[in-house]
């Protein structure tokens, strides 16, 4: 098991070499610090506690401050342990390089809060009949039909009723990593993930153990823009541009044509 703590930045879209548009979520994964190592002998299970995002020392209580001192790091804001993650030492840094494009991950976060909601929005119940006796004062169309059996004399635990919707721990499984940017500490994940922008998330290796997918080949936007500029120049010199030609192959031909043109001008 491996994992890392991150922060949701937002959603965008990218393109593959075949022109397919893919919606992705950008997750900022600044280097995490191993703040505690849990073992079976001492704790009854093994896990690795990670911490990320700096926090003012005056806002940290003494037990946590002592824990950070042992790890030889500064106080952190977001602390979570990942069970089954082993092989790391106290104070060691964990960054985005532990993942690669094509891997499947499970992402856990706090879902967006939506306030008080009725049973139709909260539990996806059906709207009642709007005619033939339904929709009257005694039978509103959006009200739950029944709260239970007449003989029970109570409402059983777990009955779907109106209440607060969202703002709860949510996990989405088997999300594909499209790109890993170790320079900017970013992960691009295919699809949406729980939580609002700037909310913290836990990214873990997928527990279902599905096979890793082949990495999606993304279009290089800089290369495409540069190639378009070179093609326009090549047209002026009647240079033949073939399918699959790269800017590295086309650029020398254009330079050669420009030098020949300059030499003819000097004559």
From Swiss-Prot:
Organism of this sequence: Mycoplasmopsis agalactiae (strain NCTC 10123 / CIP 59.7 / PG2)
Protein name: Large ribosomal subunit protein uL3
Keyword rRNA-binding: yes
Subunit structure: Part of the 50S ribosomal subunit. Forms a cluster with proteins L14 and L19.
Functional summary from the UniProt entry: One of the primary rRNA binding proteins, it binds directly near the 3'-end of the 23S rRNA, where it nucleates assembly of the 50S subunit.
GO molecular function: rRNA binding; structural constituent of ribosome
Family affiliation: Belongs to the universal ribosomal protein uL3 family.
Signal peptide feature range: none
Region of interest called Disordered, as start-end residue ranges on this chain: 124-147
Keywords linked to the UniProt accession: Ribonucleoprotein, Ribosomal protein, RNA-binding, rRNA-binding
InterPro entries assigned: Ribosomal_uL3, Ribosomal_uL3_bac/org-type, Ribosomal_uL3_CS, Transl_B-barrel_sf
Recorded GO CC terms: cytosolic large ribosomal subunit
GO terms classed as biological process: translation
SUPFAM superfamilies: Translation proteins (SSF50447)
Taxonomic lineage: Bacteria, Bacillati, Mycoplasmatota, Mycoplasmoidales, Metamycoplasmataceae
